[in-house]
């Protein structure tokens, strides 16, 4: 049995972020620093009341340990308001 931190899989992230220039660059830099490659990104329309946007990211396969470290860093960004979903995606 492999330790959880050694598992490698794709990840689905849904984030609520501040609608400011450079936010996506901050997020991709953190993921890149942990050797996590982005497969796709979708940004939903801005909520005019809260001035936040929903960003959905699908990654290429990455190690669980790296993803957990990246998530920890993302939670400390003032521009990331919430990590709404974090889902491991297995190929079947």
Task: Label each PLM-derived region with a short phrase.
Residues 1-92:
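A conserved regulatory-domain signal marking ACT and ACT-like small-molecule sensing domains
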């Amino acid at each position: 049995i492999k330790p959880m931190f050694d598992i490698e899989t794709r990840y689905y992230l849904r984030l609520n972020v501040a609608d400011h220039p450079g936010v996506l660059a901050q997020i991709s830099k953190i993921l890149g620093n942990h050797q996590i490659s982005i497969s796709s990104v979708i940004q939903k329309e801005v909520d005019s009341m809260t001035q936040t946007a929903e960003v959905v990211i699908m990654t290429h396969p990455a190690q669980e340990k790296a993803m957990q470290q990246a998530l920890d860093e993302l939670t400390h960004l003032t521009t990331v308001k919430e990590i709404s979903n974090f889902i491991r995606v297995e190929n079947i």
